[in-house]
């Protein structure tokens, strides 16, 4: 029951993060829900965990492919319907339904200048107005993003992590050459996939069907290989015993991971929302990047 108590409180902190600290991009709720499930497979062998992880990654990738394919059909139907109306022709009920589905998706996902200005005003006027604006995004996270996307995201990575732990990879017990190969191969694959995805996005002129990661069948493979590459890199740095001071500070940050994560939400709340300075939409990219090292320095030193 200790495991479930911890995950219960993680769930509570996640809900506080979403509804009090106004961060709808919270990961704690997703992690807690995944943790409830992982208890039942804690004694599985690494081989079985990897089989399950492969299945979950495949399901996630297939889901992304089907969603994008369906939306492309809907967009084509919308184009066909408009062309038919222009020519005074009738369209089938099926085409109309697909076209309507596309228009609803487009309205929900296409960002307009007026919409941005309304969001900035509501999020920077006061905490109350920011809270009211956040409610829809929070509901989308709880009732849509987590059950349909984020839960599977977290679960597949946690299962892979459990398998790597049982294979003595995460604890650095393998030879350094193993981790160098792991880092090199995984970064090569991961960066290749990510480069391809960026090319697709820019080449499409930021098409809304290309910018959404959950409409890319390569998404899970790219992030998986990048994660494995970072694991390999971190273990290599530990084994060569360099940057000892930085590693010690990062270890301390890791021990306070939950506190630091929630503090990011609190800091951002007071910097950007109406609860504090209300700087949302007022800072340039260069000014935003100056804030990042300041927060890092506070956490590390």
Where is each model-derived feature located?
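Kinked, hydrophobic transmembrane alpha-helices enriched for aromatic residues
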Residues: 9-21, 189-199, 252-278
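Long hydrophobic alpha-helical segments that form multi-pass transmembrane helix bundles
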Residues: 55-151
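Solvent-exposed interhelical
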Residues: 39-51, 163-185
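Hydrophobic alpha-helical transmembrane segments of multi-pass membrane proteins
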Residues: 20, 24, 144-155, 217-225, ...
């Amino acid at each position: 029951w200790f495991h479930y108590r911890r995950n219960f409180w993680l769930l509570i902190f996640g809900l506080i993060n979403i509804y009090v600290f106004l961060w709808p991009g919270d990961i704690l709720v997703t992690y807690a829900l995944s943790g409830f499930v992982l208890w039942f497979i804690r004694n599985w062998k690494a081989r079985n965990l990897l089989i399950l992880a492969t299945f979950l990654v495949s399901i996630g990738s297939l889901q992304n492919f089907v969603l994008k394919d369906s939306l492309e059909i809907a967009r084509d139907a919308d184009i066909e319907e408009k062309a038919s109306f222009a020519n005074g022709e009738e369209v089938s009920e099926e085409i109309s339904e697909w076209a309507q589905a596309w228009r609803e998706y487009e309205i929900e996902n296409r960002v307009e200048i007026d919409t941005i200005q309304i969001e900035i005003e509501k999020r920077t006027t006061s905490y109350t107005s920011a809270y009211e604006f956040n409610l829809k995004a929070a509901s989308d996270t709880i009732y849509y993003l987590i059950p349909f996307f984020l839960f599977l995201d977290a679960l597949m990575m946690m299962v892979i992590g459990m398998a790597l732990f049982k294979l003595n990879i995460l604890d650095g017990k393998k030879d350094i050459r193993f981790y160098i190969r792991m880092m090199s191969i995984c970064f090569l694959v991961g960066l290749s996939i990510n480069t391809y995805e960026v090319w697709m996005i820019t080449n499409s002129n930021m098409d809304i069907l290309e910018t959404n990661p959950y409409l890319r069948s390569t998404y899970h493979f790219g992030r998986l290989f990048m994660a494995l590459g970072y694991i390999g890199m971190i273990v290599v740095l530990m084994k060569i015993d360099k940057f000892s001071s930085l590693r010690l500070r990062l270890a301390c940050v890791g021990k306070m991971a939950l506190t630091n994560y929630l503090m990011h939400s609190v800091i951002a709340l007071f910097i950007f929302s109406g609860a504090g300075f209300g700087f949302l939409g007022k800072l340039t990219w260069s000014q935003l990047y100056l804030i990042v090292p300041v927060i890092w320095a506070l956490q590390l030193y």
